[in-house]
Amino acid sequence: MKPSKRRINVWITLTGLVVALVASHKASAQICRPVSERTGELGCWITAHTVLEQLPSQSIFWHLDTYPTRAAAEAAQGPRGTVVESLGKVWLLTIEGAGWRPSGGDRIAEIGPLPVTAATNYSAQYMEAIFTPGMTAPAHRHSGPEAWYTVAGETCLETPAGKMVGRAGGSQVIVPGGPPMHLTATGTEIRRALVLILHDAAQPPTTPAPDWAPKGLCRN
């Protein structure tokens, strides 16, 4: 029995909807790429990657300072500092102990302590994330702690332990290395954030987590 023309049209319509939904999901799931590959504002962009090796045997923090020019930031840069231009500003991003201060500049934040181990050599990967509400990152894990500095908007992160929300001016979000996670931009404003992955230098900073499925806690 030949399928009717109407049934064929229904199949075509349903197939088109499925393709559109899959394409939409792929478009909303963001993978971080080098800033040299940037083609637009939205997305997750790797702005710098710095080898730090072993860290001091004390509580470790991420220090964020801004400067009027790149030259001024580079003049204040220490051995564990990185200068990036991101979100319209020149930043000196430094991994050091509590209370550390560079010369000059404007202190923006001190985030930590970061959960690190004394015997591990570390590298710092810095990123700029600009997500519209609803955009996500695929389930993944890191080989060291991740921290955000949220300039605008809101981000919800689900892990097996539950969820945490980062907002501009809100409490710090620090995630230890190892557990899987799934990130979603929430709220009503575009998320703009600086991101640090302080990872084991002998391992990739980020790996997919196909062995874990989020419960959708960030949709509630």
Predicted ranges, named:
Residues 44-48, 57-67, 91-138, 191, ...:
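A short glycine-rich, His/Asp/Glu-containing loop-to-beta-strand
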Residues 2-13:
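Bacterial N-terminal signal peptides that target proteins for export
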